[in-house]
Regions:
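Short beta-strand segments
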Residues: 6, 59-63, 100, 122-129, ...
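Anion-binding (especially nucleotide phosphate/pyrophosphate-binding) glycine-rich loop
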Residues: 80-91, 95, 103
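A cytosolic small-molecule/anion-sensing beta-strand core signal
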Residues: 136-137
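Catalytic metal-binding/acid-base residues of hydrolase active sites
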Residues: 104, 129, 218
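A charged helix-plus-loop insertion that forms the helical arch/lid used to bind
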Residues: 71-81
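Glycine/small-residue-rich loop that forms an oxyanion/phosphate-binding "nest" at active or ligand-binding sites
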Residues: 77, 98-110
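ATP-binding/phosphotransfer module of carbohydrate and carboxylate kinases, centering on a glycine-rich
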Residues: 1-57, 66-68, 88-97, 109-122, ...
Length: 270
């Protein structure tokens, strides 16, 4: 049994995966900002899901920079240099525990579930924050694993800010309320414009074959993708093609799939 944990800036999902590689027994709860409370809550939910049956691995995703099981920097949780892997291992001392960045896990899972992994795939998650990952030929390269596109500085409407401060899902919710199929066109136009502000330089720099959008906003990609593509076509140099823009499969659970993929990869390579 493989246990996966998607730690978000707002909520955390814990799930086990069955032999068909699908998540089951998904439990959702608000992410505690206190690290000790977070570890205790995750451990309790894992025990509840597994009923103390053997666990092959625990694979955890965190919303920030991760190094050797340590949450080096998770801005939306206020965590800095927190040894998440070590703390969790106190509850599961005989179980392999893998810790990784959430956008990396979601990006890897998204690209691997396309009919053919692209040469260069750019993944963006729009939720509590903005996360990015770059997947090359279906592989996540260690040298690119610390990409934090959401924190790049932008000049937006005459103000220096970060992409995350204008295009995170929480920002859209604060400004427009809950996005839905009934959201008016003018809102989707503004959503697309804000996403474009950060996506345009990333496309110019990486020139991906495809852009996959996940997170809470990714659910609605089909409502703004054409608008976004049009804005990019207007503003990118003619020599740079506008990549296809799609929603991640299972955008609100794709991190769990990535955690599963990472666990399988780690277990089979050791």
């Amino acid at each position: 049994m493989i246990i996966t944990v998607d730690t978000g800036g707002t909520k955390t999902l814990v799930a086990s995966f069955d032999e068909e590689k699908n998540p089951k027994h998904i439990i959702k709860f608000p992410t505690p900002k206190n690290v000790d409370q977070y570890i205790q809550r995750v451990a309790n939910q894992i025990h509840l899901i597994t009923n103390d049956k053997p666990i092959d691995a625990i694979s955890v995703a965190l919303p920030g920079v991760v190094k050797d099981g340590v949450a080096v920097w998770c801005q939306n949780l206020g965590w800095k240099n927190q040894p998440i892997g070590e703390l969790l291992s106190r509850y599961f001392p005989h179980t392999p525990i893998f810790i990784a960045n959430d956008a990396n896990m979601a990006g890897l899972a998204s690209m691997l579930r396309l009919p053919k992994p692209p040469r260069c795939g750019l993944y963006i998650t729009l939720g509590t924050g903005v996360g990015t990952s770059l997947i090359l030929n279906g592989n996540l390269h260690k040298e690119l694993s610390d990409c934090e596109g959401g924190h790049m500085s932008l000049n937006y409407n005459g103000k220096i800010t970060t992409w995350e401060e204008i295009a995170a899902g929480r920002v859209f919710q604060r400004i427009f309320g809950e996005l839905s199929s009934d959201t008016p066109l003018e809102v989707w136009e503004e959503v697309a414009n804000r996403i474009k502000a950060g996506l345009q330089p990333l496309i110019a720099f990486t020139q991906p074959d495809i852009v996959v959008i996940g997170g809470s906003v990714g659910v609605f990609t089909s409502y703004f993708s054409d608008i976004l593509s049009g804005l990019l076509a207007e503003n990118l140099p003619a020599a740079i093609s506008v990549p296809k823009i799609i929603s991640s499969p299972n955008p609100e659970e794709i991190v769990l799939y990535g955690c599963y993929d990472n666990a399988i990869s780690q277990l089979t390579s050791n």
